[in-house]
């Protein structure tokens, strides 16, 4: 593979803020990691440790412990996408720990970056789908009763994954492993300036602005309908339910905004900051942290969308109790078997 500094133009080097041509040490992979890079690694590690068990538990409960329904299919696919997001974190931590050196080869570079955006798009689209489903349930309940079926929901989920694949095609096409020096290579998207701005703008509009507007609007309609119906039945119960709905709406909207907005803003800052700027290194590190913050949304989704539901909490409590009882019974059985075996051995020796 040719040296990157010789095959890329000055415009492309400036576009990606590549300073490695000047600063990579001939004998190694770059400078020693500083406190900020270590903080980013710790942040990634925490998201991995929290996100994997939480989403794996949701996948297990919605996939194997709950009756098949439209809602369980939404949450199963959302948890599966979030679980895959969190499982990819160690592969992103390795280049971060090696000063952005990519050690996995060109095929893994293209596949990982493409699948990463596919899964992230899928997670966002599923959040929009869940919001639209709640909107339809309160706006057209009769239509939902006639047409809202698990089989149709399964095909909708397939369509969501295909749309996410369509949105991630640029990553599969343009991302490549490039050699910066004899001892360092990076996994980068080799766009032109025009295509980079177009791709980033489209990702911002389709991956953040439209989903955020949809999520907020749908949940606000749900809250308005719930508050309008709070006049029916016991006042305190209805008022408490309305407040609970409002808290969920605020939590869902804020988590989506706070987790995704910084990443999209920093995408634009990375493109607009000259590579010789004194702020370039800090912006790159901030972009790394913003990407991890977007992963935090995968940790929060099980709590916000699933665990707040009473039916799910009952199923998860029942499942955990069954697991605990099974482990306890198995331990007792092993102890009794060991005890009886020891007694028989002693009798034979007497």
From Swiss-Prot:
Instruction: Report if keyword Transmembrane helix is assigned.
Output: yes
**Coiled coil ranges:** none
Protein name listed in UniProt: C5a anaphylatoxin chemotactic receptor 1
Task: Report, as the record phrases it, the tissue specificity of this protein.
Answer: High expression in head, kidney and posterior kidney, lower levels in peripheral blood leukocytes and spleen, low expression in brain and gills, heart, intestine and very low expression in liver and muscle.
The chain's disulfide connectivity reads 109-187
Q: Where does the source fall among the domains of life? A: Eukaryota
The family database entries (PROSITE patterns) matched by this protein are listed as: G_PROTEIN_RECEP_F1_1, G_PROTEIN_RECEP_F1_2
Parts of the chain that traverse the membrane: 38-64, 70-93, 111-132, 155-174, 198-223, 248-270, 288-308
Known role: Receptor for the chemotactic and inflammatory peptide anaphylatoxin C5a. This receptor stimulates chemotaxis, granule enzyme release and superoxide anion production.
Query: Could you tell me the Gene Ontology terms of the biological process aspect for this record?
Result: chemotaxis; inflammatory response; mRNA transcription by RNA polymerase II; phospholipase C-activating G protein-coupled receptor signaling pathway; positive regulation of cytosolic calcium ion concentration; positive regulation of epithelial cell proliferation; positive regulation of ERK1 and ERK2 cascade; positive regulation of granulocyte chemotaxis
InterPro entries registered for this protein in UniProt: Formyl_rcpt-rel, GPCR_Rhodpsn, GPCR_Rhodpsn_7TM
Instruction: Write the record's keywords in alphabetical order, separated by commas.
Output: Cell membrane, Chemotaxis, Disulfide bond, G-protein coupled receptor, Glycoprotein, Membrane, Receptor, Transducer, Transmembrane, Transmembrane helix
Topology check: give the Extracellular ranges: 1-37, 94-110, 175-197, 271-287
Report the locations given in the UniProt record: Cell membrane
Topological domain ranges for the Cytoplasmic compartment: 65-69, 133-154, 224-247, 309-350
Membrane topology of the entry:
Multi-pass membrane protein
Q: Which Pfam families match?
A: 7tm_1 (PF00001)
Residues carrying covalently attached carbohydrate according to the record: 17
